[in-house]
UniProtKB/Swiss-Prot annotation:
Active site location: C743, H1526
Gene that produces this protein: USP32
Catalytic reaction list: Thiol-dependent hydrolysis of ester, thioester, amide, peptide and isopeptide bonds formed by the C-terminal Gly of ubiquitin (a 76-residue protein attached to proteins as an intracellular targeting signal)
Protein name stated in the entry: Ubiquitin carboxyl-terminal hydrolase 32
Organism encoding this protein: Homo sapiens
Biased composition, class Low complexity, residue ranges: 1367-1399
Residue span(s) of the pro-peptide: 1602-1604
An annotated Gene Ontology molecular function: cysteine-type deubiquitinase activity
EC number: 3.4.19.12
Length: 1604
């Protein structure tokens, strides 16, 4: 088997050549060249596929390949020819020698028995019994003994049966020549075969414009209108659409064009009659006649200037005149015969025929029969265009006058119109074509010197365009200013159709039309009109070339111009070496349309990728700041011509599409010099306005992979050039440069920057008075200083974008996890940023020790006040005042019912989104009755099995589960049958379908099967199997115990092809019960082949079928069953339409079935009964009354070629009806959730699992428990984090769930813990001194809160303070108030409080309320660090009862009010919102003071309820995948306008344009807050010295630069 040389040495190459003809040799050489290219060797895989075919078993094919001399290098052509000649034309003696060589030893002198048996096992799977006779005298034999034995035992094994027994089943040449599709179609129309071949190319190009894949009215209308009026477009479409399926197939368009342009006059009139017969009832009613007259008059006005009487008559008079003269039935309508008599001499009808004649040739692609017809068609079109003049937005094409004159002589363009009867419809009598002035004279004066010809359809240039490639070419979206949207633009450099100009052709009427000189012109040559390009760069546009300016080109002398449809027709008929499209634009000064001959010729530069220097390991962790030593090189990459009237946006979109670059990843710069570039970011400016002239350089900038912009990075690296960015802009509308996947940072910074009270704090410089450079857990003030500097730049109003180098450097220094070029989580960066700002600005320089006490049954107000006081004793800053709130965490022991309550600070709410626990699946059900398949939509559990899928589908489609067969269809065949116990997979190789299969029914007599009885039961237990050679079936009996109602159509035992060779394994029983599978198949013919078996290769198409089949099924029943299912795809014409407008000779449906059934293997390529060496494509199943014993084979539905091309509706294959469940399922899957549902889920109760058991202080052991989170107090600035990234089932996934959230008047008060009013009878407390660390609490009144329940949610970020966690929870992520929030759907629960039990406070005076806080960058967790810290927190001074109870739902609710030494001042450090009044009584050492009598009566006062109403002011959005994607920010400026911050780009946009679907972090601001109250007074305070901080940064940056 491993022979390295050919085993056919006994047959020379020269001898083999003598046995093949020259034609055969040329075909074999061409086939070899097509298959192997320029190589002289054919690989093994190619040999098996192209020469032998897929039907040959792989082991056998490998043996043949090696015996021919094939090696790892390949098989030489000479050896291939020798082998093919031996197999097909070799003598028996030569074949015997060949077989001997297969089994012989290396020396080739003898065959060893052991080696032969080994090879037979590989090839055949067994050793024949007769082999022992061959080796009866020894273990090896020579050729003579082997030959004698072989000729006596020709059926011994596969090779002998193939080559010596029964003749050769494959030949070198296949002489059979079945009629081609074109020949068949030519026989049923008046078109020649060449016309049909030419027309097919045009048809597929037109059909490719369809949005649905069908040549429907939506596609047809824009192609023909104009010049066809829209009122006639539908009628014209219906005239082509014979079978009324809203699709014009190629047969229909061929017959229609034949009837309209080439048929007898009566047939043409019949075609027009169909156009006007709207209701298709065979007559023209009075209404239809009126519409016809209106349309015909419009056609006349569009195409002629002649005056006719009908133009001055009343419509009713015209209609009545026609009826009076031609209504032979006197029933008020015209029959077809009446219409034909009227239209023969009517000029209106003749003019409509002329128009249809033009459209059919120019638009639909029919080639004119004579040059004279061609000239009249083009002339008529141009005359009509000349009356309209130039229309802005249309494209015209320039043609060299030299070629145009030659063409005009060829078609006799200037001669008098030629009347060709009756083959030409251009016979308008005296109203035929007049001798008007040249059609272009009226538009000649409007030719300008500029315009745009940018085409969004990519032009395909090729030196030689084959008919196959042209026919399959699909056009894009048409010209940018296309007159016929969707039409193709087929420009090629060379496509010359050379016909003999001196030949005789028969016209449609049999008259001889003699084509005499002048000669037919060649391809259109426009080269003399253009200049040679001095720049050698790829042109991105399709202008074809720059026209010469010197000498000046003159219209009519140097060039002619034609509209786009005429150009396409001429190009289709002649070809061209150069297309010169020029669009029509309106002059900006005169507003008159003109042709722009000389558009702007632009030169486009691209950045040359710079090699990145390996950074030092020391400094790479200090932020990815660009190196200043990497100059950016820009090189000329492309050229392009654009209209001076085009906008930057249009050019940007075109370049993006042409270069296949996302629009958001590309920018354009105006290049003035190496050091002076201008960003073209105003998309509405036109080139003319920007004064961009010819040969202007533009830079195409493309984002780096790390999302940074090369030009920006270059500017940053050379900081002296950044000054050019300093241009006036709106304050705050400044972008941030991407420094390498830093959009996550930019997005968070922009959100925080648009937090107005915080920004005013930094802009006013107050942060410099509060820098805490000694905080051990801070950043020595660097974070606050760098952020403050950046904010001042962002709000200076002098720069369009800045580079956050210092802040990026600082973040990377203190948090290396944010370093590198990887995408990060913007929420994590936001948490780090807020925490860093808080610690750097913390007014508490010496943090006291605090102890966290257990709630131990104490009232919530007391525990909350204690926790909040502890928090404030260690954390006070502008960040605490604005962003911090308080959460209530309750854990309840399920053993003893003990409740432990904790109150923890937060700086944003992290709400997990409910992960999709359902999958959306759409499945198509195909029934046996042939009805249109129906698509159903299902919503299944993520772990659902196919059993559940079938059950749900059964409820929808009405079939029993036993009748549903699920199959994965791929490549028009069934690839897999999912098992019921398998889990449903969304990702399959093909698409999932459900087939109806027959089910057992009560027995029916086998003697009376009907066409619809697919489940008839057998009356006998007989079934058939095949003999060992696969030739004849023989009956066997079913063993006892098998069901006798429905018997499998398989064999009990099947040795496929008589052998078990690994290619066709034996199957014990049919895998199908009561049915078989059928596949659609057609034969694809090729003229270049090696063996006859490969000339016609099978190709599967369409959807496979399930065909009922039992042992009682007749062969005719199989045909009936198949026809029932496919008849909708190939329906014959209705009887009344059998005689169509083209003389229809199609007999493809004349016989009973348009297909033949054959028995095939599963792959559908080869026969299931015949051995492989017969190269059988499938044994035919005759349509008779015999029983059909198919076995376990498949059935191929071999379509008759004529029926396939003329009747089969390919577009109907994928047509399905959508069940209402599809829309319902899609809606349910994509249905958004609202923010309230997320909050309800967040505040719902959940059970802690066994791995997160709670240590109960009562039980003194770990117990199961439930946990619940609630909101206690809310901050002025509420940040809501939608947790799209979650860790589920061991992997991180992103939720694409859409969350709907309010932009204005968001009220979260319903989710605050309701207070008990009975506990609100108290007096406010006063601090013991004037120090800020001793808070004073004022009573506040609060509104009633409706108690609402919620379901589980997820993490909440808390403070870095030691009060982070309950000490009772086991160290587990789920043990925290945050991570124990599950991400499932919410489960409603109820609270005990009623609306009437909401708290009120009795404070007498207006108090300034402390805002909730979280000062930590760490999430709530049960880590050991937090657990230990929580034990250290003692109970501090207890805050006032009123504030603790009543203000939780109000801004800063439940917060102790801190009073500065300056009474009545607004203290930013304390986060007060309202001015306070000092209260008389206080507390000492945490003990409550006495309540005043005055305060005790406050409960009688009217409630002053203040709701925490919020407005949205910023959104951070994430688009794309997990671990990548992109962040952008939408924020509201103080000018009340919304802006989109996309890294360095900042653009104003309408609020409706905000992409809320991808929202990730929401920023809300409470209504009515006074920013000034957050600004601390700096009188008497000293500003921190930050010079050393600046020096540190400069020093570190210089070290970095040196290392670069």
């Amino acid at each position: 088997m491993g022979a390295k040389e050919s085993r056919i040495g006994f047959l020379s190459y020269e001898e083999a050549l003598r046995r093949v003809t020259d034609v055969e040799l040329k075909r074999l050489k061409d086939a070899f060249k097509r298959t192997c290219g320029l190589s002289y060797y054919m690989g093994q895989h190619c040999f098996i596929r192209e020469v032998l075919g897929d039907g040959v078993p792989p082991k056998v094919a490998e043996v043949i390949y090696c015996s021919f001399g094939g090696t790892s290098k390949g098989l030489h052509f000479n050896n291939l020819i020798v082998g093919l000649v031996l197999l097909t034309r070799g003598k028996d003696e030569e074949k015997a020698k060949y077989i001997f060589s297969l089994f012989s030893s290396e020396s080739g002198n003898y065959v060893i028995r052991e080696e032969m048996e080994r090879m037979l096992h590989v090839v055949d799977g067994k050793v024949p019994d007769t082999l022992r006779k061959c080796f009866s005298e020894g273990e090896k034999v020579n050729y003579e003994k082997f030959r004698n034995w072989l000729f006596l035992n020709k059926d011994a094994f596969t090779f002998s049966r193939w080559l010596l027994s029964g003749g050769v089943y494959v030949t070198l040449t296949d002489d059979s020549d079945t009629p081609t599709f074109y020949q068949t179609l030519a026989g049923v129309t008046h078109l020649e075969e060449s016309d049909i071949i030419d027309l097919e190319k045009r048809y597929w190009l037109l059909k490719a414009q369809s949005r649905t894949g069908r040549f429907d009215l939506e596609t047809f209308g824009p192609l023909v209108s104009p010049p066809i009026r829209p009122s006639l477009s539908e009628g014209l479409f219906n005239a082509f659409d014979e079978n009324r399926d809203n699709h014009i197939d190629f047969k229909e368009i061929s017959c229609g064009l034949s009837a309209c342009c080439r048929g007898p006059l009566a047939e043409r009139q019949k075609f027009c009659f169909k156009v006007f017969d709207v209701d298709r009832d065979g007559v023209l009613s009075r209404v239809e006649l009126r519409d016809m007259v209106v349309a015909l008059l419009e056609v006349w006005k569009d195409n002629r200037t002649d005056d006719i009487p009908e133009l001055h008559m009343d419509l009713s008079d015209i209609v009545e005149g026609i009826l009076n003269a031609h209504d032979t039935t006197k029933m008020g309508h015209l029959t077809l015969e009446d219409y034909q008599i009227w239209s023969v001499k009517n000029v209106l009808a003749n003019e409509f025929l002329n128009l249809l004649f033009q459209v059919c040739h120019i638009v639909l692609g029919l080639r004119p029969a004579t040059p004279e017809e061609e000239g009249q068609i083009i002339r008529g079109w141009l005359e009509r265009e000349s009356r309209y003049g130039l229309q802005a937005g249309h494209n015209w094409f320039i043609i060299s006058m030299q070629w145009w004159q030659q063409w005009k002589e060829y078609v006799k363009y200037d001669a008098n119109p030629v009347v060709i009867e009756p083959s030409s419809v251009l016979n308008g009598g005296k109203y035929s074509f007049g001798t008007a002035a040249h059609p272009m004279e009226q538009v000649e004066d409007r030719i300008g010197s500029s315009l745009s010809y940018v085409n969004t359809t990519e032009e395909k240039f090729s030196d030689n365009i084959s008919t196959a490639s042209e026919a399959s070419e699909t056009a894009g979206s048409g010209f940018l200013y296309s007159a016929t949207p969707g039409a193709d633009v087929c420009f090629a450099r060379q496509h010359n159709t050379s016909d003999n100009n001196n030949q005789c052709l028969l016209g449609a009427n049999g008259n001889i039309l003699l084509h005499l000189n002048p000669q037919k012109p060649g391809a259109i040559d426009n080269q003399p009109l253009v200049t040679q390009e001095p720049v050698k760069a790829t042109s991105l546009t399709l202008e074809g070339g720059r026209l010469k300016r010197t000498p000046q080109l003159i219209h009519g002398r140097d060039y002619e111009m034609v509209p786009e449809p005429v150009w396409r027709a001429l190009y289709h008929w002649y070809g061209a070496n150069l297309a010169l499209p020029r669009p029509v634009i309106k002059n900006s000064k005169t507003d008159i349309p003109e042709l722009e001959l000389f558009p702007r010729y632009l030169l486009f530069l691209r950045q040359q990728p710079a090699t990145r220097t390996q950074q030092s390991n020391i400094w790479v962790n200090m932020g990815n700041v660009p190196s200043p030593n990497a100059p950016l090189k820009r090189v000329l990459a492309y050229t392009g011509c654009f209209s001076r009237m085009q906008t930057i946006k249009e050019i940007h979109e075109y370049l993006s599409q042409r270069l296949r670059i996302k629009e958001e990843d590309m920018r354009l710069w105006l290049y003035n010099s190496e050091n002076y570039l201008t960003l073209l970011d105003d998309e509405d400016h036109k080139l003319e306005y920007l004064k961009i002239q010819d040969e202007q350089h533009l830079v195409i900038e493309v984002r780096n992979k790390d999302m940074s912009w090369p030009e920006e990075m270059s500017f940053i690296a050379n900081s002296s050039k950044i000054d050019r960015h300093k241009v006036p802009t709106e304050k705050g509308a400044t972008g941030l440069s991407n420094l390498g996947n830093t959009c996550f940072m930019n997005s968070s910074i922009q959100c925080v920057s648009n937090t107005q009270p915080l920004t005013q704090y930094f802009i006013s410089g107050r942060h410099l008075y509060e820098l805490n450079r000694t905080n051990p857990i801070g950043m020595k003030g660097h974070m606050a200083k760098c952020y403050g500097d950046l904010v001042q730049e962002l709000w200076s109003g002098t720069q369009k974008n800045v580079a956050p180098l210092k802040l990026r450097w600082t973040i990377a220094k203190y948090a290396p996890r944010f370093n590198g070029f990887q995408q990060q989580d913007s929420q994590e960066l936001l948490a780090f940023l807020l925490d860093g700002l808080h610690e750097d600005l913390n007014r508490v320089h010496e943090k006291p020790y605090v102890e966290l006490k257990d709630s131990d049954g104490r009232p919530d107000w007391e525990v909350a006040a204690e926790a909040w006081d502890n928090h404030l004793r260690r954390n006070r800053s502008i960040v605490v005042d604005l962003f911090h709130g308080q959460l209530r965490s309750q854990v309840k022991c399920k053993t003893c019912g003990h409740i432990s309550v904790r109150f923890d600070p937060f700086n944003f709410l992290s709400l997990p989104l409910p992960m999709d626990s359902y999958m959306h699946l759409e499945i198509t059900v195909i029934k046996l009755d042939g009805t249109t398949p129906v698509r159903y939509g299902l919503r299944l559990n993520m772990d659902e099995k196919y059993t559940g899928l079938k059950k749900q589908l059964s409820d929808l489609c009405g079939l029993n589960s036993e009748q549903i067969l699920l199959a994965e269809v791929h490549g028009s065949n069934i690839k897999n049958f999912p098992q019921d116990n398998q889990k449903v997979r969304l990702s399959v190789s093909g698409f999932l379908c459900a087939f109806e299969i027959p089910v057992p029914v009560s027995p029916i007599s086998a003697s009376s099967p009907t066409q619809t009885d697919f489940s008839s039961s057998p009356s006998t237990n007989e079934m058939f199997t095949l003999t060992t050679n696969g030739d004849l079936p023989r009956p066997i009996f079913i063993p006892n115990g098998m069901p006798n109602t429905v018997v499998p159509c398989g064999t009990e035992k099947n040795f496929t092809n008589g052998m078990v060779n690994g290619h066709m394994p034996s199957l014990p029983d049919s895998p199908f019960t009561g049915y078989i599978i059928a596949v659609h198949r057609k034969m694809m013919r090729t003229e270049l082949y090696f063996l006859s078996s490969q000339k016609n290769r099978p190709s599967l198409f369409g959807m496979p079928l399930i065909v009922p089949c039992t042992v009682h099924t007749r062969k005719k029943d199989l045909y009936d069953a198949v026809w029932i299912q496919v008849s909708r795809l190939a329906s014959p014409l209705p009887p009344q339409e059998a005689s169509n407008h083209a003389q229809d000779c199609d007999d493809s449906m004349g016989y009973q079935y348009p297909f033949t059934l054959r028995v095939v293997q599963k792959d559908g390529n080869s026969c299931a009964w015949c051995p492989w060496y017969r190269f059988c494509r499938g044994c035919k199943i005759d349509c008779g009354e015999d029983r059909a014993f198919i076995g376990n084979a498949y059935i191929a539905v071999d379509w008759d070629p004529t029926a396939l091309h003329l009747r089969y509706q390919t577009s109907q294959e994928r047509v399905v009806d959508e069940h209402e469940s599809v829309e319902q399922s899609r809606r349910a899957q994509a249905e958004p959730i609202n923010l309230d549902s997320c909050l309800r889920a967040f505040t719902s109760e959940e059970e802690l699992g066994e791995n997160e058991m709670y240590y109960c202080s009562k039980c003194k052991t770990h117990c199961l428990a439930t946990k619940k989170l609630d909101l206690w107090r809310l901050p002025p600035i509420l940040i809501i984090h939608l947790k799209r990234f979650q860790f589920v089932n061991g992997r991180w996934i992103k939720s694409q769930k859409i969350v709907k959230f309010p932009r204005e008047s968001f009220d979260p008060s319903a989710f605050l813990v309701p207070r008990d009013p009975a506990l609100c009878q108290h007096k406010p407390l006063t601090p013991q001194g004037d120090e800020l660390s001793e808070p004073r609490i004022l009573a506040r009144e609060v509104k009633k809160v409706d108690a609402q329940s919620s379901a589980g949610e997820e993490d909440v970020l808390l403070s870095k303070s030691p009060s982070s966690l309950s000490a009772n929870i086991i160290s587990s992520p789920k043990g925290s108030p945050s991570s124990s929030r599950k991400s499932g759907t919410s489960c409603p629960s109820s609270k005990n409080s009623s609306p009437n039990s909401s708290p009120r406070t009795l404070g007498r005076s207006k108090g300034r309320l402390r805002l909730p806080q979280i000062g930590s960058k760490n999430k709530l967790s049960s880590s050991k660090e937090n657990l230990d810290a929580s034990k250290e927190n003692g109970a501090g001074q207890i805050c006032e009862l009123a504030d603790a109870l009543s203000r939780g739902h109000v801004l800063g609710g439940s917060q102790p009010e801190l009073v500065t030494p300056q009474d009545h001042e607004v203290a930013l450090a304390n986060g007060f919102l309202y001015e306070h009044e000092a209260c008389g009584n206080g507390y000492s050492n945490g003990q409550l003071g006495n309540h005043s009598e005055e305060d005790s009566t406050d409960d009688q006062r009217e409630d002053t309820r203040i709701k925490p109403i919020y407005n949205l002011y910023a959104i951070s959005c994430h688009s794309g995948i997990l671990g990548g994607g992109h962040y952008v920010t939408y924020a509201k400026n103080p000018n009340c306008k919304w802006y989109c911050y996309n890294d360095s780009s900042c653009k104003e946009l309408h609020p409706d344009e905000i992409d809320t679907d991808s929202a990730y972090i929401l920023f809300y601001e409470q209504q009515g807050i006074d920013y000034a109250q957050f600004l601390p007074k700096t009188d008497g305070k000293k500003m921190a010295d930050t010079s050393s901080m600046d020096e540190d940064f400069e020093s570190d940056y210089k070290k970095y630069c040196v290392l670069q």
